[in-house]
Regions:
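Active-site rim/loop-helix segments in enzyme catalytic domains that contact anionic ligands
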Residues: 1-106, 227, 239-246
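Metal-dependent de-N-acetylase/amidase catalytic core
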Residues: 2-17, 91-247
Length: 247
């Protein structure tokens, strides 16, 4: 387990905790949101649950180094978990408890994970389900495996879609405006850090095209779509922001 900022791995709290199944999932799926949040002064910690061992291109060592560099570009800290390995992630309560331990340790307000849609890499859908379970387990004070940590209830769980096939059909998205040039530049640089995966720019161009499409839906130049696990609660109408429909 390594981090770009080891102080975040022990007891320091973070604002946002992001889980990804493989190196580059976070960068491609919600890297612009991470960049926007860290540039606004919020702390973000990334948890990568494999080193891309099953991938066609790049060694595990390369993949880990690329993710570490991308996290630095995004302004986030990072750690890697050894679970079942790339393409072997299983639905096991032990994994959910391990994720819950991270949630209790870092006490984030917001947690992001890959969507639970089945028509995508199986690690992605399973990770989304495991993180959802972990968010609940983290707030159960009587969990015998976690009695050494104080329970913690996150405020919101949001999903991101790495590919178009992973977009939930039954959840209305929230759109995060990522149009600021410095955000887009940092996000693009973080994706480009995964050199072993970028023999061409096709995948990066796909993500930029998706951001443009979401932006068109949101009435801005570029946007990232996130999908809330639960209804969002606002203290007043003034907090809701603007709607995507431009009446």
């Amino acid at each position: 387990m390594i981090s770009t900022d080891s102080s975040n791995l022990n007891s320091s709290q973070v604002s946002i905790l992001v889980f990804g199944a493989h190196p580059d999932d976070i960068e491609y799926g919600c890297g612009a949101v991470v960049a926007s949040e860290t540039m606004s002064g919020r702390s973000v910690h990334l948890v990568v649950c494999s080193r891309g061992e099953a991938g066609t291109n790049g060694t595990p060592e390369q993949r880990e180094a690329e993710s570490t560099d991308a996290a630095r570009i995004l302004g986030a800290s990072i750690e890697f978990l050894e679970l079942d390995g790339d393409a072997h992630l299983e639905m096991r309560v032990e994994h959910a408890i391990r994720f819950a331990r991270i949630i209790r340790r870092l006490r984030p307000q917001t947690v992001l994970a890959t969507t639970c849609m089945e028509n995508q890499h199986p690690d992605h859908s399973r990770l989304g389900q495991l993180v959802r379970d972990a968010a609940r387990i983290a707030r159960y004070g009587g969990m015998k495996e976690l009695l050494d940590q104080e329970a913690h209830a996150i405020e919101q769980l949001l999903y991101y879609a790495v590919t178009p096939e992973a977009v939930p059909r039954d959840i209305n998205p929230i759109f995060i405006d990522i149009s600021a040039p410095d955000v887009m530049s940092r996000w693009t640089s973080a994706m480009e850090a995964h050199k072993s995966q970028a023999a061409t720019r096709n995948y990066i161009d796909l993500q930029l095209t998706r951001a443009s499409l979401f932006g068109a839906q949101a009435g801005v130049e570029f946007a990232t779509a996130l999908y809330p696990n639960d209804p969002l609660v606002f203290g007043s109408l003034a907090q809701t922001g603007k709607g995507a429909r431009r009446f």
